[in-house]
Amino acid sequence: MDNMLPSPGYNIPSIGTPIHHQEDESIQTQQQQQTPRHPASFGMNLPHLQHANISQTQDNHMMSPAIQRQHEGSMSIYGPGTPAPATPHTPASVADPGIIPVLENIVSTVNLGCRLDLKKIALQARNAEYNPKRFAAVIMRIREPRTTALIFSSGKMVCTGAKSEEDSRLAARKYARIVQKLGFSAKFLDFKIQNMVGSCDVKFPIRLEGLVLTHGQFSSYEPELFPGLIYRMVKPRIVLLIFVSGKVVLTGAKVRQEIYDAFENIYPILKGFKK
């Protein structure tokens, strides 16, 4: 076995490595020239990384502005001259102005399920008035929630003035309880919200003349009769009253979300007619 070992001055070539040492050295030299300056992928120590970053930063400062812009464009992962995509913080449109309409009034109806003697109710109940020559219903008010009820002899009742859906239902139940205490077999049937009214302020004046000319199919504006522009939105089916001052009233909704959707639709239009 000792006779098979090579002499100390002889190097055994590795498998697959050519014996031509000059060509091997030239290939290694080309590979070293093609390797990047940043040794981050090779697991180098942190001081070498910092030194490489500092030297590259100094090289960038020494470049001319035109060469530096070209260099930065070539380093972008999207290619030179390609802008970076918009981040989630970049506003895409004016669809989110940060203005939320406030509910001002909710109108609901309920069926008490019995015939009512309106004179008896008006005489015995508090905060109730009845004038059949003017209006064929008892007008009753309570303080909490601050609402007004119209009570008809057929047993139908309309509740107005609530600021939320919960307050409207609570007020209607209180009115039904008052009628029960007066000796009527009143029930609480078919409660339904019929109309919701909201309002908001866009905080800028609006050119109503230009708006009615552009959107004449959906709007009408007669300042001699009414100072606001009436805009009838198709979807959602909402009527908007738009004033020069920037105040907007939204009515005709059955649910709260319709108010919000209608304002999101109209705000970009109003933005286009800002004075």
UniProtKB/Swiss-Prot annotation:
GO terms for biological process: DNA-templated transcription initiation. It is found in: Nucleus. GO terms for cellular component: nucleus. Sequence repeats lie at residues 103-179, 193-270. The keyword Cell division does not apply. The keyword Calcium does not apply. It comes from the Eukaryota. It holds the Pfam family TBP. One of its GO terms (molecular function) is DNA binding. Signal peptide: none annotated. Residues 23-45, 73-92 are annotated as: Disordered. Keywords: DNA-binding, Nucleus, Repeat, Transcription. General transcription factor that functions at the core of the DNA-binding multiprotein factor TFIID. Binding of TFIID to the TATA box is the initial transcriptional step of the pre-initiation complex (PIC), playing a role in the activation of eukaryotic genes transcribed by RNA polymerase II. Belongs to the TBP family. HAMAP family: TATA_bind_prot_arch. Belongs to the TFIID complex together with the TBP-associated factors (TAFs). Binds DNA as monomer. This is TATA-box-binding protein. It comes from Artemia franciscana.
